[in-house]
């Protein structure tokens, strides 16, 4: 509670144009899961997760409210970003929305905020998922070994990064997790497959199974 209060206060104190807040929220979870398969695998994994979200409000000259937010998340509370800086960054992002307006459609250079990376990777992930490939519902069907992006882009699926939120020792089928280069300098190198999708495509699993889905 105190951590959330300090974060919210930092946002409100940052600039007089921050007129209010929709609150600051701290969420924390600790849990574990066991996996036993008919193939003889038995495994157990546990972990924790903590996040902080701050949502300040500002106001246009015409009275229109603008809402912004910033967040931080880590495996462990002791490693969470400083709550005061999270609050201040939330205020900065909120103030950037002042004067925002619609523009006509056009082709132009775009600078992505770092947070946009998560959304972009989510879209890429759905397109390289084995289920999407064998069902032929992805535009990346039959694109292995071809350029699918700028040569400046390299994407790595690495569930072995120490303390990373998505890290795991084994996948949903009990196969040992591994690091895969998905896109290297713009070239599509692999799809992400569980055993079923791998069999459908005649390819080995990349240990990418998640419980309750095929990919």
Language-model regions: role of each:
Residues 7, 143-215:
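Dual-mode signal for accessory low-complexity, basic/Gly-rich regions
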